[in-house]
Amino acid sequence: MEWEPVIGLEVHVQLRTQSKIFSGAATAYGAEPNTQACAIDLGLPGVLPVLNKEAVKLAVCFGLSVNASIPPYSIFARKNYFYPDLPKGYQISQYNFPIVQNGHLDIENEDGTTKRIGITRAHLEEDAGKSFHEGMQGYSGIDFNRAGTPLLEIVSEPDIRSAQEAVAYLKALHSLVRYIGVSDANMQEGAFRCDVNISLRPKSEEKFGTRAEIKNVNSFRFVERAILFEINRQKEILENGGTIVQETRLYDAVQDETRSMRTKEEAHDYRYFPDPDLLPVEIGPEFIEAVKNQLPELPWEKRKRFAASYQLSNYDVKLLTTQIEIANYFETVLKIDKTIPPKLAANWINGDLAAALNKNNLSITQSPINAEQLAGLLHRIADNTLSGSMGKQVFETMWGGEGDADTIIERHGLKQITDTEALEKIIDEVIENNPTQVEQYRSGKDKLIAFFVGQVMKATKGKANPQQVNELFKKKL
């Protein structure tokens, strides 16, 4: 029997606010344990939560960017469960009246086709603290710095049918929340975490199978591997006549497997009820319009503009716009020097710069070569001061911190030879020294032109303009 996976994702996005969702405590990552937790975060008696307006604004911003509806009011509820890092014994979340409802996000599959993934809802909630077990013998520690940090939980429809589609959706979502400034979405810091709900059903059936949930998967690669493992696990059980247990599972990256954690809770297990300490949030049309007017250019809008304005291929556009920082870097280069061809800038940013960043595990914001410096280098390539190979030489020297392109060109004598008279003298020598090859070329062996150009490049130590040399040879021969 052929089985079809049915996958839905719940993504927890940490909102980019200076303070927590219900208190004034800071949200900075990496502070000493328990130095950013106040009485409200710790659930101490005699204190009341106060909603952070910026968190509401960011949630609405996300909702508008995925064409969702923003209801006129939203209610916070208490989600009751016990866990050591949940100091109040409940989490303030949303249940029946979430702040974002019924949106969608389009993804591009590997074959270039587009698929629309529905977004059921996105709701605001507070994060829990963090338990520590390593380095502590016989006991565990709890850091409450994260408790109360604002989260937006984004719940997709079960529209995803493969591990590849799941990763494409997550990457599109990750890119979007960074573009609109809702979150830094730093996965290493836990600011973008994913729960995967997955079930199998016979290919021809509409009814869903029993689902398992895989909790807190924090990388695109692990999401893909966890889904592939879970599909095979469920398939093996079903084909051997067994039944799938509705449960919560954990993904073990070392063993590359999912393991049972606990039976899956239903909503009634959490005994949701409206939080009596928080009034319903009223969201008027004026507020929504104000947020809408502040929305930046969205990823798909930027892709269309890049393709139209800069005449770039889909491949180049996709690489340049995946991250907002790369797109900004590219446009900064072109604004600094309008003589630089967009294709030249795209080739260098997607090629040499991207390779150097990957090799050194750096983001583009950490690049030793800023946009102004790269613009200086590309200007010298565009005006034929440097050949492409010489440009690579200068790039490597710039990466090492030896100054801008002009300084390096002057210091190392790397200026390209473009003087026609000087080049013709060298060409005449090459022709004179290679009579056999000249005769063969004139007999129709056109590919020998590369040999002649190579001889000139060798004589000039790579400083000649190969295109110019090519044209001069053709005229001479």
Curated annotation (Swiss-Prot):
Disulfide bonds: none annotated. It comes from the Bacteria. Allows the formation of correctly charged Asn-tRNA(Asn) or Gln-tRNA(Gln) through the transamidation of misacylated Asp-tRNA(Asn) or Glu-tRNA(Gln) in organisms which lack either or both of asparaginyl-tRNA or glutaminyl-tRNA synthetases. The reaction takes place in the presence of glutamine and ATP through an activated phospho-Asp-tRNA(Asn) or phospho-Glu-tRNA(Gln). PANTHER family: GLUTAMYL-TRNA GLN AMIDOTRANSFERASE SUBUNIT B MITOCHONDRIAL AND PROKARYOTIC PET112-RELATED (PTHR11659), GLUTAMYL-TRNA(GLN) AMIDOTRANSFERASE SUBUNIT B, MITOCHONDRIAL (PTHR11659:SF0). Its EC number is 6.3.5.-. SMART domains: GatB_Yqey. It catalyses: L-glutamyl-tRNA(Gln) + L-glutamine + ATP + H2O = L-glutaminyl-tRNA(Gln) + L-glutamate + ADP + phosphate + H(+); L-aspartyl-tRNA(Asn) + L-glutamine + ATP + H2O = L-asparaginyl-tRNA(Asn) + L-glutamate + ADP + phosphate + 2 H(+). Heterotrimer of A, B and C subunits. Pfam families: GatB_N, GatB_Yqey. This is Aspartyl/glutamyl-tRNA(Asn/Gln) amidotransferase subunit B. GO terms for molecular function: asparaginyl-tRNA synthase (glutamine-hydrolyzing) activity; ATP binding; glutaminyl-tRNA synthase (glutamine-hydrolyzing) activity. The lineage of its organism: Bacteria, Pseudomonadati, Pseudomonadota, Gammaproteobacteria, Legionellales. One of its GO terms (biological process) is translation. It comes from Coxiella burnetii (strain RSA 493 / Nine Mile phase I). Keywords: ATP-binding, Ligase, Nucleotide-binding, Protein biosynthesis. Belongs to the GatB/GatE family. GatB subfamily.
